[in-house]
Structure formats: C-alpha cells, structure tokens
A protein has these predicted regions:
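Glycine-rich phosphate/pyrophosphate-handling loop used in enzymes and phosphotransfer proteins
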Residues: 1-251
C-alpha cells in the first residue's frame, strides 16, 4: 500500500524530491540514495508500524476491510474534526523521531516529518481538498520554554513540499491558557483539560482547514481545536498527524 502511494506522489512532486531530500534517513541515519523519498529510506518506510494499515477515515484508529463502521469508537463519540490523515502508528522508530524533535530540539527532523505528512495527504483516496494549514498552538509560556512549535515547523515543511499554494496560518488559532500535559491523563481528564483552552483570532469562512499535530491519542486536542475553527466559519477540519497512538497510550 505504501509503496503504491509513493510512486504517484513522487511523480506529482517531480524533481523537488531530489532537491529536498536530506543527506540521511531521519529514522536510521542511513545515507539516502539519489532520488530517494525525502527524509526516510525505503526500508524504514516499509518497516513503520501502521504505515500500511487500514484506518477509520474519521478518527484514524485501525480498521479492517470488513469492519462494521459502528464498531469504531468515533461512531458513538464523534470527534470535532471531519477526517484524519495519519502517517503511521506511534511506535518505534517513528516515536523516537517525534520525541527527538519535540523534546530533543532536533529541528532538522521537522522537514522529513512534514514531507511524510504531505505524501500521505497527497496519496489520500479519495483526494482530500485543503485550503490552508493551521498548526496546533502551544501556550505562550510553553512556547517560550521550548523555543519553537514543532507542529508549525512540520506544517511549513508540508506546505513547502507541495506544488500548489497551501498557506500556513500559525497565529489565528491560539492557546489562551496553560493546560496540564495530556500524557498520563485519562480520556475524561484529557477532554476536560482542554475545554476553553483555544480561541481564534481570524475567520475561516467556507475553508477546508488542515489541522496539523505530531501525535493523536484521544483526539481531545484536535477536537477542541476543530470546534473553535468551525465556530470561526471553517467548512471542514482535517486532522493531519504524523503518528496515531491508541487511546490508552501514555503519549
């Protein structure tokens, strides 16, 4: 499935791949061959857990070809976003790359992660239309402590990878209060933790918004963000995540 995805995406992006590819694979540090998929070698692409799995189009949780749509948790607890695009599962080796970017300050990893996300979006079937990208924001205090927002850096990389204009709007969705870290909280605690945490400084009337985040676990952050974006007029909100964790994951 993933191999089939790469060919049309590579054709669509054309020679940009050869110019954008960093020197080494972001997952294993192996030197990339000329013309390789940007950022990640083929061996690591094929080895990423969940890269080839069928997923619920709405929430991104694993599904099977014969699965009853009603069996998915989002059939009874609908998320605020309309669809999910996920590169792979939150598992080795992808989890190490995500945490190295987020907590290890390895900003060079934002580019290959954004490129992977762009490839997964471009390979979506049916095609998903996006008008703009909005990164999930950090609170001012957390941004000051970390020094950067990893989701903004990934969104910029994603936008730079595609040929069609895809504006990144980093300052419209705002986190207006500090919240406890989501990791380690129960599902209910995650939901309550984020109520009233976001506001929107602009309008998105009629737009299809790509909401970028690194990891989705319960979906609470994306749900609350999507609620605020739709209140600001967004026609649809598509969750774009590098890694999809299970709901009981500590991520």
């Amino acid at each position: 499935m993933l191999q089939g995805l790469l060919k049309p995406v590579r054709r669509r992006l054309g020679v940009w791949f050869d110019h954008l590819a960093p020197r080494g694979c972001a997952l294993c540090d192996q030197t990339l061959a000329p013309g390789a998929f940007p950022g990640v070698c083929m061996a690591c692409l094929l080895a990423m857990p969940g890269a080839n799995r069928l997923r619920c189009a709405r929430c991104g949780l694993p599904a099977s070809a014969s699965a009853d749509r009603q069996a998915c948790p989002c059939s009874t607890a609908s998320p605020g976003f309309d669809q999910t695009v996920a590169v792979a599962d939150y598992a080795a080796p992808l989890d190490r790359v995500v945490t190295s970017l987020k907590f290890g300050r390895q900003l060079n990893l934002a580019r290959p992660l954004g490129e992977l996300l762009a490839a997964r979006w471009l390979g979506s079937s049916p095609a998903i239309h996006l008008d703009c990208l909005v990164p999930v924001p950090l609170s001012p205090s957390r941004l000051a402590h970390r020094g950067f927002n990893q989701t903004l850096e990934m969104a910029r990389s994603m936008a730079a990878t595609v040929r069609t204009p895809l504006p990144v709007m980093p300052f419209t969705l705002r986190r207006i209060r500090d919240t406890a870290p989501q990791s380690g909280l129960s599902l209910d605690e995650r939901r309550h933790n984020l109520v009233g945490a976001f506001s929107c400084a602009g309008r998105f009337d009629g737009l299809h918004v790509g909401l970028v985040d690194d990891v989705m676990t319960s979906g609470s952050t994306l749900t609350e963000s999507a609620r605020v974006l739709k209140a600001a007029g967004a026609r649809s909100v598509i969750a774009l995540v590098v890694a999809r964790a299970m709901r009981d994951s500590p991520a």
